[in-house]
């Protein structure tokens, strides 16, 4: 079975990460895959979509995304059709060339090649398919996508809830503040203002815990922050570098501003398995995570609560241990292996149904 994946690929965004997690696990299991990705010129127009590694031999760059000025994208459909695939996974997101995706899915359907969509769009208005029932199944990460994003766009029996996957547990060996310094770390491309609660919170935290270091690695220009406890570097980190940085830190401060859209934080699912204590704002990105005694992260709602939680975690070893245990449990329950099992079973059930 050759699985086609229509998606961003090798890029710094949640769409690409999801496709890579599932795609590479299918590849590891012996399934050939073909990835149909956007042209590099098209992909690079969007600030959050930067390539992080060269393409593999199974990647075919064959479509233009919607342009920033609203111009409709397009697919070189012949490039797709000349590849032999038995099934197509569409990682659906708001910059897709929707008209051509529909056209492609219908052509494949007529050839007996079924397709499913995985919804990354966060708002009902973002989805611009004229008929989503062309897909055999429409997969979403949680119930919010059913109620707020899909609504009446697709028949209920076609919807499948499959959570966003986690990379496996890879615990580091660092003891908390083992060198006498409490080390904090952030990475990524988040807007500058989303770091403000952490900077302001650490200024207060330092009054009780003066030996603090906050390392920020961003893939764009450094923040205009001139605090002596802040160290900055401009660099795109690959996964192994991220893991190494987190294993050298005591806290991972994850900046995410709130939104009305339905969203998940792919960053969290990528790195929670390091078991470095992760701190997150209690907003839409993280609202489906367990809270209270089962929380796999440290939540905060404002700077005062952030400081309170950081002090508690720094002083209470049992609290830190509990958070890590919860994180490990969450990662195991949503491991990329388990989630790929779900997709593998779904794909096989659709193919068997189509044969009969």
UniProtKB/Swiss-Prot annotation:
It comes from the Bacteria. GO terms for molecular function: glycosyltransferase activity. It catalyses: bis(myo-inositol) 1,3'-phosphate + GDP-alpha-D-mannose = 2-O-(beta-D-mannosyl)-bis(myo-inositol) 1,3'-phosphate + GDP + H(+); 2-O-(beta-D-mannosyl)-bis(myo-inositol) 1,3'-phosphate + GDP-alpha-D-mannose = 2-O-(beta-D-mannosyl-(1->2)-beta-D-mannosyl)-bis(myo-inositol) 1,3'-phosphate + GDP + H(+); bis(myo-inositol) 1,3'-phosphate + 2 GDP-alpha-D-mannose = 2-O-(beta-D-mannosyl-(1->2)-beta-D-mannosyl)-bis(myo-inositol) 1,3'-phosphate + 2 GDP + 2 H(+). Keywords: Glycosyltransferase, Magnesium, Transferase. Its cofactor is Mg(2+). Its EC number is 2.4.1.361. Belongs to the MDIP synthase family. Catalyzes the transfer of the mannosyl group from GDP-mannose to di-myo-inositol-1,3'-phosphate (DIP), producing mannosyl-di-myo-inositol phosphate (MDIP). Can also use MDIP as an acceptor of a second mannose residue, yielding di-mannosyl-di-myo-inositol phosphate (MMDIP). This is GDP-mannose:di-myo-inositol-1,3'-phosphate beta-1,2-mannosyltransferase. The lineage of its organism: Bacteria, Pseudomonadati, Aquificota, Aquificia, Aquificales.
């Amino acid at each position: 079975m050759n699985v086609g994946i229509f998606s961003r690929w090798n890029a710094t965004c949640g769409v690409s990460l999801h496709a890579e997690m599932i795609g590479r696990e299918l590849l590891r299991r012996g399934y050939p895959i073909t990835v149909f990705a956007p042209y590099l010129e098209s992909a690079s127009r969007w600030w959050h979509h930067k390539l992080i590694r060269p393409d593999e031999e199974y990647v075919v760059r064959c479509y233009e995304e919607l342009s920033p000025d609203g111009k409709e994208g397009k697919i070189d459909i012949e490039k797709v059709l000349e590849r032999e695939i038995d099934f197509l996974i569409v990682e659906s997101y708001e910059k897709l060339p929707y008209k051509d995706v529909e056209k492609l899915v219908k052509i494949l359907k007529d050839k007996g090649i079924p397709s499913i969509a995985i919804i990354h769009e966060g708002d009902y208005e973002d989805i611009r398919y004229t008929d989503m029932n062309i897909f055999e199944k429409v997969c979403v990460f949680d119930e919010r996508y059913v109620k707020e994003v899909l609504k009446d766009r697709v028949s209920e029996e076609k919807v499948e809830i499959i959570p966003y996957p986690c990379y496996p547990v890879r615990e580091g060996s660092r003891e908390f503040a083992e060198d006498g310094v409490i080390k904090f770390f952030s990475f990524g491309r988040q807007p500058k203002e989303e770091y403000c609660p952490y900077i302001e919170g650490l200024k207060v935290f330092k009054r009780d815990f003066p030996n603090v270091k906050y390392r920020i690695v961003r893939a764009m220009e450094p923040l205009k922050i001139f605090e002596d406890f802040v160290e900055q570097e401009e660099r795109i980190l690959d996964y192994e570098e991220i893991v190494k940085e987190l294993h050298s830190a005591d806290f991972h401060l994850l900046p995410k501003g709130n939104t009305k859209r339905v969203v998940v934080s792919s960053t969290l699912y990528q790195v929670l398995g390091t078991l470095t204590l992760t701190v997150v704002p209690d907003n839409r990105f993280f609202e489906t995570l367990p809270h209270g005694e089962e929380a796999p992260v440290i939540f905060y709602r404002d700077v005062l609560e952030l400081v309170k939680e950081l002090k508690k975690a720094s002083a209470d070893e049992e609290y830190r241990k509990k958070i890590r245990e919860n994180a490990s449990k969450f990662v195991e329950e949503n491991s990329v292996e388990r989630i790929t099992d779900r997709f593998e079973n779904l794909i096989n059930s659709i193919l068997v149904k189509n044969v009969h």
